Structures are given as structure tokens and as C-alpha cells.
A protein has these predicted regions:
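Alpha-helix boundary/capping residues
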Residues: 102, 122-126, 176, 201, ...
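ATP-dependent adenylation/nucleotidyltransferase module used to activate substrates
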Residues: 2-170
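Catalytic subdomain that performs nucleotidyl-dependent activation
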Residues: 75-78, 104, 136, 165-230
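Secondary-structure boundary/capping residues
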Residues: 70, 107, 206-207, 262
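Short, basic, helix/turn surface patches
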Residues: 73, 133-143, 188-195, 231-243
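Residues on a specific face of well-ordered alpha-helices
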Residues: 59, 93, 97, 146, ...
């Protein structure tokens, strides 16, 4: 029996047509707790942008460490939230709203602009080339992850990712940037299901109704994810939930999934075959 590309992708990304928000929250908090204990780490660190995904992941992490502290009877575990703006963030109020919702144990702000600009300048001086705005956007994402790991190493923490199914299918993340993490608690959720979890957790409506943006490009500040993808999250979620969408949209999604497969794997070795099976 031939399995359709849609069914293959749904199974690979562990998506479900519907969820029970309370059960999903419990499942993901328990996952965070169990893996933290397995890794012998002391907590989690995550950058908070003010958007839906980092707000949800951050709140789940905070709840997980609070439960672990209660179970252990001591303050051995913590969650650190990072603000990592490139200069001045135009929607800083949203980031502060997210922090109020998450209530992290600690939060720090580090401006990544000097480090990013220094890396761009060194590249351009050393090569005589001009770094593209897109390449610089990836540099921002990778610098943020570098900062995450400085905190992780200092405090013995796990770096948390915010990748969910709608980003996974499109490869909409920077390799070794926001994709370079230790643990990914939102895996398998569609964008709409993430909103359901935030509503259940009592998040301010602004957090989950705000149009998503990676906001990495200098020349297109605040560019919406959906504009860059050329597909709405509603269409992507429908596909991931097993619903029928237009053949054009399905083909576009399946093509993006295949050409970004390398992003969903560790570095390829001579013994890997997944890349030959596309």
C-alpha cells in the first residue's frame, strides 16, 4: 500500500488533527522534567521575542522547573529568559508582556548588535565581499544561539528551541541558529494548537494573535512569516492536520519539506542514507 506524501510527513512530524490542551501541557511539562533529570542539568535557557512560540515554550519551562523544585524540596532548578535584541526592538512592549506572562526565575538582556556587526565587518574586510541582508539575518540567529550556550555552560542549563510542526515542514529556521538547541518541547504542534495551549495557560491575547515574524532582515523589518513563506499558517496547519488543501499549496509544502530535510538531521556521515531516499 502506497502512503501519501502528506501522511508520511504527518507521521514524521508527529502531528495530530486535534488535541486536548490540558493533556498536551501536562505531556510537555513532564517531558521537560524527565529529560532535564536525565541530562543532569539544572534548568533551561530560552530567548524571548514576544511572539507566540517563545512565550509558550518559556511558560512550559518555568512550570517544569517550579514542579521540580517543589518535588525536590530545594531550589536546585531554574529557568532563565533572555532578551537578545539587535539594537532596539520595535516591539519591545510585546517582549515585556511575554516576560510578565512567563514569570521567569531570572531574565537578562544582551544587545547582539555589536557582535553581529563585528562579524559582518570581519567577513567583509577579510573577503572583499558584501554580506547579503539574508546572510546577516542568519548571523543574528546564530549569534543569539551563541549567547544561549554561554548561559547554558555557565549555569549547566539546556538550551530550549521553539520549533513546531509548521516551522519544521517548511524548514523555517536557521541551521545552528534557532535550530541549534538541546530540547524542543513544541515539536508536533501546529501553529493553531500552540495558540490553544497559550489560551489554556491564560496568556494575554496579544501574545497569540500577534502576526508571527522572525524579524531578521534589516531591509524588511517586521516581515511576516507568511509573506516570506508564501503560505498562510492556516493552510500549513490544515495540511498537517490531514485536511485537503489545494494541489498547488500541497506541492509547495512537500517541495519545501524535501529541500530542507538536511535541516532536520545531525551532520551527515558516510553511513547515512536518508538523503538518498528523497
Amino acid at each position: 500500500m502506497t502512503i501519501s506524501p502528506q501522511r508520511t510527513i504527518i507521521e514524521a512530524l508527529h502531528t495530530k488533527a486535534s488535541i486536548d490542551p490540558a493533556e498536551e501541557i501536562r505531556f510537555r511539562i513532564d517531558f521537560l522534567k524527565d529529560y532535564l533529570l536525565y541530562a543532569h542539568a539544572k534548568g533551561f535557557v530560552l530567548g524571548i521575542s514576544g511572539g507566540q512560540d517563545s512565550s509558550l515554550a518559556g511558560r512550559l519551562c518555568q512550570l517544569a522547573v517550579e514542579e521540580l523544585r517543589a518535588q525536590a524540596g530545594k531550589d536546585d532548578y531554574l529557568f532563565i529568559a533572555l532578551r537578545l535584541p539587535y539594537g532596539v526592538q520595535h516591539d519591545e512592549e510585546d517582549a515585556q508582556l511575554a516576560l510578565q506572562f512567563i514569570q521567569p526565575d531570572r531574565s537578562y538582556t544582551i544587545n547582539i548588535k555589536p557582535a553581529v556587526d563585528g562579524a559582518v565587518e570581519a567577513f567583509e574586510q577579510g573577503t572583499g565581499l558584501t554580506m547579503s541582508d539574508y546572510n546577516k539575518g542568519n548571523q543574528k540567529a546564530q549569534e543569539r544561539m551563541t549567547v544561549h550556550y554561554r548561559f547554558a555552560h555557565h549555569f549547566n542549563l539546556l538550551v530550549v528551541g521553539t520549533d513546531h510542526a509548521a516551522e519544521a515542514i517548511t524548514g523555517f529556521f536557521t541551521k545552528y541558529g534557532d535550530g541549534g538547541v538541546d530540547i524542543s518541547p513544541l515539536t508536533g504542534l501546529t501553529k493553531q494548537q500552540g495558540r490553544e495551549l497559550l489560551r489554556h495557560l491564560g496568556a494575554p491575547e496579544r501574545i497569540y494573535t500577534k502576526p508571527p515574524t522572525a524579524d531578521l532582515l534589516d531591509k524588511r523589518p517586521g516581515q511576516l512569516d507568511e509573506d516570506e513563506l508564501g503560505l498562510s499558517y492556516e493552510v500549513i496547519d490544515s495540511y498537517l492536520s490531514g485536511q485537503e488543501i489545494s494541489s498547488e499549496a500541497a506541492q509547495k509544502l512537500e517541495r519545501r519539506y524535501h529541500i530542507t530535510e538536511h535541516k532536520r538531521h545531525l551532520p551527515v556521515t558516510p553511513f547515512d542514507t536518508w538523503w538518498k531516499e528523497q
